[in-house]
Swiss-Prot record:
Keywords associated with the record: Activator, ATP-binding, DNA-binding, Nucleotide-binding, Repeat, TPR repeat, Transcription, Transcription regulation
Protein name, UniProt field: Transcription activator GutR
Keyword set includes Signal: no
Residues where ATP binds: 200-207
Native organism: Bacillus subtilis (strain 168)
Source lineage: Bacteria, Bacillati, Bacillota, Bacilli, Bacillales
Amino acid sequence: MAELENRKQFAQMLAPGVKTLKLHPDYKVRRKKNEKTGQSYIDKIALQLGVSPNTIKSWIGQMGANYIPGRIDDGKLFGMIWIILEKTDLDIEWLTDLLEATTIPVIKPALPVWAASCLKKAKILRKDGLFGAPSEGEIENVVKRLFHDRPGQETNALTEQPITHNLPSRWSGRFIGRSFDMEAIRQWMLSPSPVCLITGWAGMGKTTIALEAAYSCVDDTSVWPAFNSIIWVSADWKGLSFSDFLNTIAYQLGRKEQIDKSINVKRFVVRNALANYTREKPILLIVDSIDTAERDIHEFITSLPQGVKVLLTARENVKQTYRESFGEMTAIQLSGLDQTDAHEFFQQEVHHCLQTCNLPRKREKLEQLLHLSSDLKNEFISATAGNPKAMALSIAYMSDDDIPAQQLIHELGKAGYSLLELFEFLFGRTWDRCNEDTRKLWQTLCFFSKPPDEKSLAAAAGLDARRFHYAMEQMRSYALIQPERSQGRTQYLAHQTVVAYGEQHLSEQHEYEKEARNRWAHYYIDYAETHLKREQPNSIYWSYLLGRNLDQMKQEWPNILKVIQWASETEQKEILIELITRISHFLSRINLPLRIEYGRKAADAAHHLGQHTREAYFRIDTSGWALMEVNDLDGALQQIEAGLKILEQSDAHDAYDLKVWGHALKARLFLKDGQQEKAETILNEIENQPISPTIQHRVLLVRGDLSFARGYHVEAIQLYEAANEISSTYGGEKTIEAYFNLGVAYVKCDQFEKAEEAFEQMLYDKHNANQVELIYYHYGMAQLLYRKGEKTKAVESNQKAIRLIDSWEPAIGIRGEVERLARATKENE
């Protein structure tokens, strides 16, 4: 029994760990409709430990200080500790601090062997239905996580330090005014208050001041507080999904492997990563335009760990949403610039227009604006309510309008517009002065998930390069858009009020919207064609087998995905089919669940249009192959057989080839299921069939798998080598399966140099390999090292593979093999 020497301290240390489990998907409570009570997360933990829920509540002080026990059974205590350390990001310091409140001996600084010995005492309900200690492999995984960053411990190749910040570029060269508001933000950063909300009308500069405050923390650490990381998330472009929100945070914290995970897993991991990184210094999380974001984002913010400071901007006042959760929060209501700052902003904006203008008449009008009387400037500032965006739009309008500036200022003053009416007036007058091409650009801005570049925006609007640049120059001169140079190309950023006004006009132009969306979609079809299509093989589907440089596709992926989603939602079947045909193989390295989802939708679309061969491709390879990769063998078999049935009625050129591949895939599926005889029967039936090199390559790989499964390793090597030689006739594939299986076969034959060479063939760029490549590489090297007798290195390499599997796709088919090797290395120690 463990005696609790300091019961209060023990409860205070244990409680946060237990409560953190409440958010974990394994313990999250799901009550049925109209059900008054249900199993709580503590009930689930209690079941796993074999104690009552009240026992756990007493341990964490939830029933009062008098009910905290004086002693706890070692197995139960370490069982509780095991669950917390396995499911959360709590570190070794938490464990030592907790145990110091007991009579259990503590080694400081902690050592891996000591931590492992503690966890071996845990008694939990295991998967086999018996109470006992976790497996050796499970304990080793947790211990490696606890000590991964200690000197002498090799770190995971994919573990990254948090990026300092991801702030966008400043919109203006010099920030003017707002000294009182800036000081209020600085004081909030230094205070215990977790949330600061900046509200104000559109165009007041909420984004600008939030950005300036963030840059102040980066540039001037002597006055502004230092943060471990500053994370900027913007909902400005067409709203912000919860998944995008979590992805951004995960990426900035060096957890990019979480990007393709389920929402529940990602939510839990991201929250714990935030807690982990805030132990030394706080993190500043800035969410721009929070009022347009999904409700889940609001809920996530209200449960952030201590040490995360959240700066929000919103047009609407959402104070009540957060006040109920935080009690104390800082709220800053931005009003217009004061007279002095507004005068300075006026001068700066006019000078900026002069620098970008080379038209004599327009320059003359701008010069006149510089010399307006103070009274006229004051009248102008009053009419625009000191709103920076309204002032910029007005200056751009006055410099181009035939009406004298003085007259327009008087008209604005007399009209007494509200700010909303003023924007309508300014956008309306600006719209009237825009030429047709500029209006086209303006209306198509709303198509994009991320700011477009010249080619995509021009294509959507239907403009050639000359007309695009003329229209873009007009948009710039009217202060509607801001070019930003990033990653070697120019993107065009627009304020959300500008995008919304263009979308409003687009909704009234049904014919133009139809044409523009069609151009937009076909631009991205052509984009995928350009960046994915190979010269060989010549096929409607196999031509898009992956090359190796996917940077261009990844840059535009958010916008491509938006086209796919639009095509699916609006039943643009032809467009969906063309896109999925091109990106199916790309999705195998980006997101297998998306490949499955849209592969099925594309198959349904092809079925509706009578495109039988395309439907078969989508069912057999796009969906069937991917389902097999995530170990859904029943789902894979269903799709493959549906595709084969379709091909019975097709005499298309590709149909025979695809039919052979469908049968070979079935054989591969039976091999995965341990049914070697069924697999062999199918392979014998399709033997010596006249097929293309692309399919021949794949069939030989499956034949190699059968030989390998039967222990005929030399024969397997011959088949794998033959498959790779055939693929070289059409440019090669360098598929992971081909080189991984070849490498393992060489390991079995003790040809270690050739094995290592084969494994390295999977990594096109060793320094920038993706997760799935690294999973197979580390597992292959683990087998090689184990065969050579280098047991310690083998275990380390295998653990890397397991960690990558957990973070990329836990259901990936190879997982069982990797775990079997982990058990084998333990048994032979």
